[in-house]
Amino acid sequence: MMFGNGNGNGNGNGSEGPGESETGRLEAFSDGVLAVIITIMAFELKAPAGHDFSSLRERIPALLVYILSFTFVGIYWNNHHHLLRAARRVTAGVMWANLHLLFWLSLIPVLTEWIGEHYRDSVPTATYGLACLGSAVAFTILVRAIISADGSASLVATAIGRDAKGRASLVTYAVATGLAWVTPWISYALFVAVAVMWFVPDRRLSRP
């Protein structure tokens, strides 16, 4: 889900309400974890062994996987930011759902390195697909936890509705994971397709 955020906090005096303070702390914690995840991925990039183009060419698959993973994490950071800006309450369920999402995202750096070195093999590709699927499921759980906390008439609940794009992502990741055992290249194409789909702006939670 790609959400928009507003400028005001709804209390008219510019001060921060209790709910916004809670969601702000949760967002700050999550931002820190996501920053570490991206940093680890960058540290795991290896320079070409030689000084010619053939050495660089050998590292292109790993670089492409890094770009895909960076985009993947970046999309979740963007969506997570807008989702928490729209949320009003942070319950224990929301906190655990948020940690569940961060768990799956924390697997991305090690899987990025693995698949970058073995991009032709089914097991690393399928495992990467499982991490993508797990992250998508975890984000859906987080959304539902926020709706449960804020109520069925909340902004998040009203705006998201049946969430066709989210459901399509879950199905695509599941298919990509299964097809990794046939040919990893189809899986990569599906991973990219999901990323492209989420690049299209979705302003369901935009505020004036």
What does each model-identified segment do?
Residues M2-G8, G12-P208:
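Multi-pass alpha-helical transmembrane bundle typical of ion/small-solute transporters
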